[in-house]
């Protein structure tokens, strides 16, 4: 077995660089959050052309004594790929445009949510959680569940809702353009846990003959109003799902344990008519893999869903799943005569279409 003593200097250097990249990775996301809060992407866009540091400092609401530090912030953000620098001037990259306020597909809220102190603190409590009886690291850090905390904090609730809506915008664009076949021929669809209805609205608009219903908890739909073929109803997915020939679950099941997911899927199965229908699931998909993997297997397609899996553990003690785990849930929920298709939609997010007969 190779030891530290027998490793070459080059190997030790590679190991140290890998460690440093992992350890200090959050510096990049923290810098990105800072840029979003300061409005740097919008300032550059409004300027209409690349900005030099003097112009950028003048456009931002910062303490004049901190102006000399902006170039250091921009330097790390250029390295991260959100901005480009040429001849001492900065411009937005295609990645950086996702943080513009007026971009319909912006993910500003997600950045602010992920770096919110309430969501960062549970990661620090992860080790403590492994040694206690709390339901989640979030509960260890805050003394209450994630859902109870969000409900009690209006600012965080607003940020969470905006983040979910932004995510739905991205998913909706893909579904109604590249995956229209999933909805063709359907008469009714219930978006379970659909919140403000961002995804359901897009589907209802793209398919005017499809009756769409958003079913969520009373406080989530209290201020929402339907229109045309879109409606909102208050309900609890653990008690009853409104009847329809298709049920949509976007980023719902990864919040829950296998046992709770089976309960939800059973309610979905009960909501679908005797002649059959489909459950449409939009969620992360883990790669099927063995107990080990190659030392150099560090690709984004693998790392992104694994990071999301850890986030589900930390926040709500939920989980992401691989194909075998999804199939186990379907069988556990009583989907006896069924078939399913899994198709990548956006990054590590997949569309799982479960067709079955009751």
Curated annotation (Swiss-Prot):
It comes from the Eukaryota. This is 3-O-methylredipecamine 2-O-methyltransferase IpeOMT3. CDD domains: AdoMet_MTases (cd02440). O-methyltransferase involved in the biosynthesis of ipecac and benzylisoquinoline monoterpenoid-isoquinoline alkaloids natural products, starting by the condensation of dopamine and secologanin, and including emetine and cephaeline, drugs used both as anti-protozoal (e.g. treatment of ameobiasis) and as emetic agents. Catalyzes 2-O-methylation of 3-O-methylredipecamine and, with less efficiency, the 7-O-methylation of (S)-coclaurine, (R,S)-N-methylcoclaurine, (R,S)-4'-O-methylcoclaurine, (R,S)-6-O-methyllaudanosoline, nororientaline, (S)-norreticuline and (S)-reticuline. One of its GO terms (molecular function) is protein dimerization activity. It catalyses: (S)-reticuline + S-adenosyl-L-methionine = (S)-laudanine + S-adenosyl-L-homocysteine + H(+). Expressed in roots.
